[in-house]
From Swiss-Prot:
GO cellular component: cytosol
Family under the similarity heading: Belongs to the methylglyoxal synthase family.
Gene name of this polypeptide: mgsA
Location of the active site: D71
Binding residues for substrate: H19, K23, T45, G46, T47, T48, S65, G66, H98
An example Gene Ontology biological process: methylglyoxal biosynthetic process
EC number: 4.2.3.3
CDD domains the UniProt entry points to: MGS (cd01422)
GO MF annotation terms: methylglyoxal synthase activity
Stretches assigned to coiled coil: none
Protein name (record): Methylglyoxal synthase
Organism: Histophilus somni (strain 2336) (Haemophilus somnus)
Amino acid sequence: MQTTYRKLAKNKKIALVAHDHCKQDLIQWCQTNRTLLQPHILYATGTTGNLIHQETNLEIKNLLSGPMGGDQQLGGLIAEGKIDLLIFFWDPMNAVPHDPDVKALMRIATVWNIPVAMNIATADFLISSPAFQQETEIRIPDYQGYLKERLK
């Protein structure tokens, strides 16, 4: 597949997601990094977003809770180029009923080549990267080229 580039603005659109056993870790991470997160546009699945807002007072655009379709909503936003970065603290020790949705979310984040952090260490690396604080580009699939090729 051919590729093209997409600009990520200085103020990123960041998705925040956490499984139940990881919510407190994500809330604490957001609290620790509140100043760095504040200028960005933050999205979250329902329960996680409400808890983060309550504890940090960060403005969050809440979607549905993950099991109710929030993971799929995020996947749609990623495919539309409306999410630049995904912070997803997931619990590798416990299966969740919506595991297929989680797998689909991770797949679509990989297809569209957005940075993804699945643990605190990686989230710390992302947020401390110079690219986090400035405009940058990522390589993405050339969907128009893909479509043109398929419609020949």
